[in-house]
């Protein structure tokens, strides 16, 4: 399990942090370029990349209806934050020698989806890491294998919502 659950200011958030052997500029492109996002992010993304810019998320397999978001922070190549439905995703990049420390924080609308979303983001991020490294994607459909670990770690209150449809 890569994600941790935090409770601050009355809200729950998931946090993932990993050092990557790539410069911030390369990681930034993977986080913001629609062609790169298609390799690891769960939806297609249309975005006006500036604070206040409109976003549109469309699931590739029609798992759910498209939905809108908004760019909240855009500071290349350091911070990219946006509304993801009722949640807020914040990607932060910090140079670290010849690499980058990537931190993803997902501020959740409700605690009950923490295990579901934690498993989902872990699988997505593993696909991102593989894309950056030029290696094979480690089974992008392995959510079912990862989810039970998050349920066990986060507990029943963080596990009330099941798998994405």
Regions found by a protein language model. Name each.
Residues 11-17, 54, 66, 79, ...:
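Intrinsic-disorder/low-complexity, polar/charged segments enriched in Ser/Thr/Lys/Arg/Asp/Glu/Gln
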Residues 1-44, 165:
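Hydrophobic ligand-binding cavity/cleft-lining segments
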Residues 38-86, 161-165:
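Glycine-rich portal/gate segments that line the openings of hydrophobic small-molecule binding cavities
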Residues 5-11, 49-51, 73-75, 94-97:
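Short, ordered beta-strand-loop transition motifs
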Residues 72, 79-132:
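Beta-strand/loop substructures that line and gate deep hydrophobic ligand-binding cavities in soluble
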Residues 32-33, 42, 76, 126, ...:
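Residues at helix-coil transition
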Residues 108-165:
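A conserved amphipathic terminal alpha-helix motif
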């Amino acid at each position: 399990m890569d994600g941790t659950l935090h409770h601050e200011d009355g809200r729950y958030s998931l946090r993932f942090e990993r050092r990557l052997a790539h410069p911030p500029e390369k990681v930034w492109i993977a986080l913001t370029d629609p062609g790169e996002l298609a390799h690891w992010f769960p939806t297609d993304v249309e975005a006006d990349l500036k604070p206040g810019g409109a976003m549109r998320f469309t699931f590739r397999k029609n798992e759910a209806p498209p939905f809108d978001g908004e760019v909240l922070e855009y500071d290349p190549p350091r911070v990219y934050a946006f509304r993801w439905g009722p949640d807020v995703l914040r990607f932060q990049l910090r140079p670290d020698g010849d690499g980058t420390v990537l931190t993803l924080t997902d501020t959740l609308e409700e605690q009950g989806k923490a295990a579901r979303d934690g498993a989902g983001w872990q699988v997505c991020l593993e696909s991102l890491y593989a894309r950056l490294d030029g290696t094979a994607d480690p089974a992008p459909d392995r959510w079912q294998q990862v989810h039970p670990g998050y349920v066990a770690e986060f507990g029943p209150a963080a596990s009330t919502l099941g798998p994405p449809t």
